UniProtKB/Swiss-Prot annotation:
PANTHER family: PHOSPHOMETHYLPYRIMIDINE SYNTHASE, CHLOROPLASTIC, THIAMINE BIOSYNTHESIS PROTEIN THIC
Biological processes per GO annotation: thiamine biosynthetic process; thiamine diphosphate biosynthetic process
Organism, scientific name: Mycobacterium leprae (strain TN)
Reactions catalysed according to its record: 5-amino-1-(5-phospho-beta-D-ribosyl)imidazole + S-adenosyl-L-methionine = 4-amino-2-methyl-5-(phosphooxymethyl)pyrimidine + CO + 5'-deoxyadenosine + formate + L-methionine + 3 H(+)
Highest taxon listed in the record's lineage: Bacteria
Residues binding Zn(2+): 348, 412
Described function: Catalyzes the synthesis of the hydroxymethylpyrimidine phosphate (HMP-P) moiety of thiamine from aminoimidazole ribotide (AIR) in a radical S-adenosyl-L-methionine (SAM)-dependent reaction.
Cofactor annotation comment: Binds 1 [4Fe-4S] cluster per subunit. The cluster is coordinated with 3 cysteines and an exchangeable S-adenosyl-L-methionine.
Protein's name according to its UniProt entry: Phosphomethylpyrimidine synthase
Gene expressing this chain: thiC
Cofactor: [4Fe-4S] cluster
Length: 547
């Protein structure tokens, strides 16, 4: 940390295990010959004496044995190699890196599959050489769908302490990456705190800081100011950067008849520059030099969709797909320079138009990982856009999108707070997991099966612990049945003891076992007994109260 940082009051963050779980690690051999790799996971302890292990993004913040010192930052990962090129270059050379071995264990996949997907450009490992604090992860359609959480201050509200807290909070609930979209004061300092304390890759949009350097006037931006800003962020350790190099002058005119015009902040900045200067943007004309800078640090391109649709009316229009074609051309240039690249996508798209976006991206961009903001499936629900967008996110992820950028309830309304961040992450973890199930991703259904078994066996504490949000699941249950005996009761407050379908089913199975029958035979025998009982009472539907 810099001297300026050390003088800042240290933020407070949430630490400690998630209820019902503990932090655990596996030792994995390092293919580089360095120290063994310590791969983290979350272990859920079940009342049966068994356990269930989960992919974990929370870093040391859920490890009670870890010493958390935000001013000092997280301890660096040992054995980071800076002089052998990018993950893409090494994968193409046939090398399985330490990061690939780490990821293979986390994903439950062969390390060779990880290498091949990276070599083909279908997956990226965002891991700047200068960000050794991260736990390596992968973004690609062959792997689990990932979720990004946006944080960052604005000129109106928030502070460094709040953004650090949001970063730790988001990763606690499953954010796989973080984007710092700060546009207010202390952009460099805020980013430094986040980077030194983030266990997940950190992305940025460099044009925001470059704009601050010219006091918010897009027409004053230059290639030199932007380039120096990128290098500054590369030196700090940013893992991936959004670059709106596909916003061309001729495409800007295509947005004139849109309902919502250009809604991307970066896209609007570059559109303003192009119109003011009557030429193509410096991001486009200097893209090859930018590729060399990114490759030097192994920073991953996130080629931004500056012309994404901001309303259902504008979905899949000429401007959007024209930019996508240019992003495809740029992605090929980036890979020639050895830089990793993923493609950003929309936006606001009705459900019947979503799959077309994935198919076109895969065709034009050689299956580079697709990273989408939602998309929102409808425009009518401000304050609930974490839901409208999670619907679209599940559909687009099933079709092949590799990473989903979350949307919070505050989308279109204001800067998200801590609660909004959690709500957004949970909504998107649901969408990502639903897509993994639909795609047949290995291990995805194991968690569903474990929770369903616990539910059928009325192991309430296990249900809570296996859920995406254990504290909230427990809170909802305890609102009506708070007593401890209710944690083993064979009913909840929805149906009560008489109408619980699972209890009735369990009773049928007990009856079958007692009489040496299978379940169908038990049902038939039970129906026969009830029929006889009905006949004994004179075939009367209603009996006198005395009986």
């Amino acid at each position: 940390m810099t001297e300026t940082l050390s003088k800042t009051t240290e933020p407070s963050v949430t630490t400690g295990p998630i209820p019902g779980s503990s932090k655990a690690y596996r030792e994995v051999a390092n293919p580089d010959g360095g120290p063994s790799l310590r791969v983290p996971f979350r272990r859920v302890h079940l009342s049966t004496g068994a356990h269930f292990d989960l992919y974990d993004t929370s870093g040391p913040y859920t490890d009670p044995d870890a010493v958390i010192n935000l001013t000092a930052g997280l301890p660096p990962r040992p054995g980071v190699i800076r002089d052998r090129g990018t993950q893409l270059q090494r994968a193409r050379a046939g090398e399985i890196t330490a990061e690939m071995a780490f990821i293979a264990d986390r994903e439950g996949m062969p390390a060779e599959l990880v290498r091949v997907e990276v070599a083909l450009g279908r997956a990226v490992i965002p891991a700047n050489h200068n960000h050794p604090e991260i736990e390596p992860m992968i973004i690609g359609k062959a792997f689990a769908v990932k979720v990004n959480a946006n944080i960052g201050n604005s000129a109106v509200t928030s502070s460094i302490a709040e953004e650090i807290d949001k970063m730790v909070w988001a990763t606690r609930w499953g954010a796989d990456t973080i984007m710092d979209l700060s546009t207010g004061k202390n952009i460099h300092e805020t980013r430094e705190w986040i980077l030194r304390n983030s266990p997940v890759p950190v992305g940025t949009v460099p044009i925001y800081q470059a704009l601050e350097k010219v006091k918010g006037d897009p027409t004053k931006l230059t290639w030199e100011i932007y380039r120096d800003t990128v290098i500054e962020q590369c030196e700090q350790g940013v893992d991936y950067m959004t670059v709106h190099a596909g916003v061309l002058l001729r495409y800007v005119l295509l947005t004139a008849k849109r309902v919502t015009g250009i809604v991307s902040r970066g896209g609007s900045i570059m559109a303003s520059w192009c119109l003011a200067n009557h030429r193509e943007s410096f991001l486009y004309t200097n893209f090859a030099e930018l590729c060399d800078i990114f490759a030097r640090y192994d920073v991953t391109f996130s080629l931004g969709d500056g012309l994404r649709p901001g309303s259902i009316a504008d979905a899949n229009d000429t401007a959007q797909f024209a930019e996508l074609r240019t992003l495809g051309e740029l992605s090929k240039i980036a890979k020639v320079h050895g830089a990793q690249v993923m493609i950003e996508g929309p936006g606001h798209i009705p459900m019947h138009k979503i799959v077309e976006n994935v198919r076109l991206e895969e065709e034009l961009c050689e299956e580079a990982p697709f990273y989408t903001l939602g998309p929102l499936a409808t425009d009518i629900a401000p304050a609930y856009d974490h839901i409208t967008s999670a619907i679209g996110a599940a559909v687009i992820a099933q079709a092949g999108t590799a990473m989903l950028c979350y949307v919070t309830p505050k989308e279109h309304l204001g800067l998200p707070d801590r609660k909004d961040v959690k709500d957004g992450v949970i909504a998107y973890k649901i969408a990502a997991h639903a897509a993994d199930l639909a795609k047949g991703y290995p291990r995805a259904q194991e968690r569903d099966d474990a929770l369903s078994t616990a539910r059928f066996e009325f192991r309430w504490n296990d249900q809570f612990a296996l859920s995406l949000d254990p504290p909230t699941a427990r809170e909802f249950h305890d609102e009506t049945l708070p007593a401890e005996p209710a944690k083993t009761a064979h009913f909840c407050s929805m149906c009560g003891p008489k109408f619980c379908s699972m209890r009735i089913t369990a009773d049928i199975r007990v009856y079958a076992a007692k009489h040496g029958l299978d379940t169908e035979e038990a049902i038939e025998m039970g129906m026969t007994e009830k029929s006889a009982e009905f006949a004994e009472h004179g075939n009367r539907v209603y009996l006198p109260l005395t009986q």
